[in-house]
Amino acid sequence: MSRSPDAKEDPVECPLCMEPLEIDDINFFPCTCGYQICRFCWHRIRTDENGLCPACRKPYPEDPAVYKPLSQEELQRIKNEKKQKQNERKQKISENRKHLASVRVVQKNLVFVVGLSQRLADPEVLKRPEYFGKFGKIHKVVINNSTSYAGSQGPSASAYVTYIRSEDALRAIQCVNNVVVDGRTLKASLGTTKYCSYFLKNMQCPKPDCMYLHELGDEAASFTKEEMQAGKHQEYEQKLLQELYKLNPNFLQLSTGSVDKNKNKVTPLQRYDTPIDKPSDSLSIGNGDNSQQISNSDTPSPPPGLSKSNPVIPISSSNHSARSPFEGAVTESQSLFSDNFRHPNPIPSGLPPFPSSPQTSSDWPTAPEPQSLFTSETIPVSSSTDWQAAFGFGSSKQPEDDLGFDPFDVTRKALADLIEKELSVQDQPSLSPTSLQNSSSHTTTAKGPGSGFLHPAAATNANSLNSTFSVLPQRFPQFQQHRAVYNSFSFPGQAARYPWMAFPRNSIMHLNHTANPTSNSNFLDLNLPPQHNTGLGGIPVAGEEEVKVSTMPLSTSSHSLQQGQQPTSLHTTVA
């Protein structure tokens, strides 16, 4: 860029390095063509490059073509003029920002709460998950203990809660506003911030953690004191609520609980989708300071001493001494997020009704719970449903969102099917020829009315018959496991050596059951497949024998025992 030596303009930038020209470079023109550069670039071109002028490509002479150093008077004059211009610029900015002293800017992520009792006037308390921490991540909490907000309820504290996200602040306002706690009605709204006095003076603020504004805020969110008295800032808040509701209709519903990997604790999970007039049926599992709400409308009645809306079950015995953080508070005080609200928050104009009410948060405790299970090792119950409720088991009725899968029911049906299949099996392991020889050698087949029954030939044959019965469980181990249930295959009593022989033949009930699942047969009823056998002396029998061992069912056996009869009979059919 060329300029004449006599030009009296403001310093400009060097065309090569784009740095402002210093005062000494104002009258420096190294080339006869009048192309002005700074002395630093001129020295670099001559020493490190080709030494040619960037404009006319002529070699630079040893001495600059025009160089007139400024005198001290000229330097002082230039400095004074520059300072004066800077002061004028600052004054102009201050005059433009002077009207901002009475302007307040609504902060979308700042919640202002009025009406806090002294018990709640603690930043660490308000940051807890039971309180404002449940709505989102909090950046900072500032408590104002000034009594300027005191009303008919007496002096109270106010708090500024700054959230990371603006939607968390709106959710907190909808859930906390007009809630009665400790006999005081809380009022919550978006907070406003004024401009820093140093910013209004166009000066650097010395406070690193200054909470005031140091830059111009949104014009739509800026309101004067007169406009705020007219409620303009509340209209802006309702507008933000409408916009957020259009983007996310379920913004009042908190996100699902998550597990902290470091502490292995469940973070709070709260849902605000229960109507105001219906108390929430939920199961609260407490562990330390954290709690988890599980919605369950079909849960049976809780144990005595616990409210139905919030039964508490301790997870570990080490936390039995856990209490609400507010020891010494009045027990009758209402919970901040209970459903007993005196002034429900109005729905913004122009919006359809919310699918969920914001006033159903019931986990902001104000006093120790009087009948909590944390104080006792036992759980009082009065019915079977109480046990189910005490240990977290729901009723048999499936919730709407359940898939209808009941592991116990499926297992029970599978076991019943397995037993039915065992009863319907027709092909069982056959007896060995030796056992058939023993049984046939000790029994005789009689003809007549009593044919078909096994009659002992001698007293010793009864011992053989007893040994035959004792061998059956060993040869059929699959029936051994059912002996505790079906015990009709035993010989009761020791009144005589062979008491069953003393009964008349007509008093013994003839049982000829076949093992099929539809009949009233005992599971020990055996249909043995026909097989070849040898008679006495090793002579083979031409025909095939079908041996059927039948026992009395459980019901028939008990009936026979009441009449003093022998419940067991052995029936052999020879084909």
UniProtKB/Swiss-Prot annotation:
Mapped zinc finger ranges (C3H1-type): 190-217
Gene name linked to the record: CNOT4
Coiled-coil regions listed in the entry: 68-104
Native species: Homo sapiens
One Gene Ontology cellular component: nucleus
SMART domains: RRM_1
Protein name per the record: CCR4-NOT transcription complex subunit 4
Assembly and oligomerization: Interacts with CNOT1 via its C-terminus but does not stably associate with the CCR4-NOT complex. Interacts (via RING domain) with UBE2D2. Interacts with ABCE1, PINK1 and PELO.
Chief site of localization: cytoplasm
Cross-referenced Pfam families: RRM_1, zf-RING_4
Biased segments, Pro residues type: 345-356
Cellular localization per UniProt: Cytoplasm; Nucleus
